[in-house]
Structures are given as C-alpha cells and as structure tokens.
Amino acid sequence: MVLYFIRHGETSWNVEGKMQGQTDIPLNENGIRLAQETAEGMKEIPFDLCITSPLSRARQTAEIVLGGRKVPIIEDARIEELSFGNWEGIGCRPENYAVPTPIEEFQKFYTEPFAFVPGEGGETILQLCKRTKEFWDEVTAKPEYEDKTILIATHGCALRAILHNIYEDKADFWHGFVPVSYTHLRAHE
C-alpha cells in the first residue's frame, strides 16, 4: 500500500487568520492555484482510490489533484479538521486575536497541544488523535487496499494527528507542512 497525504490549499480564512476547524470554507483563488501546482507534480502517480475529508476545501484539492482521472472518491469524516467549537471563524493571530481566552492559554495549541482546551463544542488534540487513529488502523488493515496507491486529502491538524500515531516521538505533535504539501508513506505489516 502506498499512501499520499495532501493538505488542502489556501482559503480566505487562512489568509485572514481565522480558525476554520470544521467550518466548511472553500479554496480561494490562490488555494486553487496551489492545488493545480500540486496536481502537476503528482500527475504521473497512478492513484487507485482517493479518501477525502468531506469539507469542501479538502475535496476540491483532491479533485484538482486527480485532474479528472476516473478514481473513486470516498469521504470520511474521521479525517476532518480539529473542531474548535464556538471559536471557529474567530481571529487567532496576535494582530486579530479575538478568542475568548487569554492569548497565553490559546498559545498552548502550539506550545503544549495536548494541554490545549478548545472552545465550547470543540475537541481536544487527544480526541482528534483517537479518531484519526481509527481511520489509519482501518485503512491500513484492509486487505483490498494492500496493493493500492491511495490519495488522502485532509487538513493540517488532522494530518499531524494521523502521523502522530506512527511517529516514534509521541511528544512532538507539530511537524511542519505548508498548504497543499504532500506526505508519501508506504504501509506494510
């Protein structure tokens, strides 16, 4: 099994410094351009299947990368972005900070992610890791996927959570990627 993970392209809320979470924000013009550049770099990869977050920014990115190829696309909510609850849509950068908690507490999202407490109705990093681990375990255990090349379109935090489940250094949650980056893994017993 060969897995290619991609993070969605840029959205208007990325540019504005707003927390997106599970709010369905589509790609902006630059996000579409970034996805097209990624598609160019991945055009020779013979994908058998695509699994995507149901959020439009991830699905749009996947569809652009696939470029009209006849590849089945499956949506899976377990690879949606972390839910920030009632903080979604709120500015979270120092210049537009509007989160109803002291900025020092919010910064734990970056400095101590496992101690981060989201807004009401949101989920913790541990909850995100749990649902993405269920996804990982199911996909990598399916015998019908054993010889497949699979594109997985997801989100920055969700992708980090998936990878967190397989990294040796469990304390290091944040590994850097940029919008529409891709991560290539081979999964085997």
Residue ranges and their predicted role:
Residues E105-Q127:
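Short glycine/proline- and acidic residue-enriched helix-loop micro-motifs
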Residues E10-T61, G121-K133:
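Loop-to-helix element that buttresses phosphate recognition and phosphoryl-transfer chemistry
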Residues T183-E189:
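Conserved small/polar residues in nucleotide/adenosyl-binding loops
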Residues G156-R160:
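GST superfamily/GST-like fold recognition
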